[in-house]
Amino acid sequence: MGISIKGLNKAYFSEGNKIRALADVDLTIPANQIFTLLGPSGCGKTTLLRCIVGLETPDSGEIAIGGETVWSSERGIFVPPEKRGLNMVFQTYAIWPHMNVFDNVAYPLQARKEPKKDIIQKVKKTLQFVQLEGFENRPATKLSGGQQQRVALARALVAEPKVILFDEPLSNLDAKLREETRKELRDFLTTLKITAVYVTHDRVEALALSDLIAVMKDGRIIEIGVPKKIYFDSDHRFVADFIGRANLIDGTVRAVDDSYAIIDSSIGAIACPESPDTSPGNKVSLCIRPEFIRVMADDTPQKRNIFRGKVESLVFVGEAYEGEILIEDTRLFTKIEPTARVEAGDEITLFFDPDHCFVLSK
């Protein structure tokens, strides 16, 4: 079930100042997809989520879920949260410590006064789905973080909602468990073919979970795209920098040669794929991800995108070294294989993959 948002505005007043949490947001969330709202703290993503579920009242605009308007300032429509057919998984899970797993999951059905036989059947089916069969009588206080997250998911699923909304549900888990749980969560949601709206500030989480990502800043949607498009070929400088470590280099288009634009920059000429923004004379910004800057042998023949630089620092992070390289007066970030014989202070030869040097249009 899809969600349509038109002209949504929400402002707060703090210490006499007006803060626009949402500024004329227009957004269409497709049915049966995992749609992530990604952005830094204070960008408006949680406010937008709370407006969708009905926990916040917008100042103006319209929200429709499955074609039914649930909020409209112009037409005076407000459908209360409990009648919107939504469920929400919070950051804290909100698992009741005095209840066992069965009672936690069954609570939404008990609140609707469904027949006991139906409740038992639905809870059993849902616990099987989230791989918690046999945990029915386990006290909530005896569950691991990952198990609590699955109980919260089961409680959201058992009522068969039209849409599930997630407000940073993995942020309290340790790194390893977070990786395992986000894979499980994607598998669950993909199998169910349910519409999910997911809020996070974690870019890796967004890339791993999502079918579509909307990047927000200052109450506005800056860019929407599939994860690979957002990461490898984003349009906006802010998005390119936020979604992952990026080397941003300004320059001027000198010429276009054999489908590649030649950009004059502070470190020299850089070749990148031709695009509508690479007309000769145009001033452009290039984005080059660290993983597409490779260390080469010192005797590598001169060709496009070969540069010499000095290693300023190296940090070992397990699967690679994260290096800071100085080329002329420009500091760049790169990833270097852990087996490479490179040390801080070395002069090295670098190659920028031309097919992964992309021009930012905004």
Spans of model-derived segments:
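ABC ATPase nucleotide-binding domain
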Residues: 4, 28, 64, 349-351
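Pre-Walker A (P-loop) beta-loop-beta motif of ABC nucleotide-binding domains
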Residues: 25-36
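Conserved ABC transporter NBD signature motif
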Residues: 61-73
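ABC ATPase nucleotide-binding domains
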Residues: 85-87, 91, 95-238
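Glycine/charge-rich catalytic "coupling/switch" loops of P-loop NTPases
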Residues: 232, 260, 265-312, 339-362
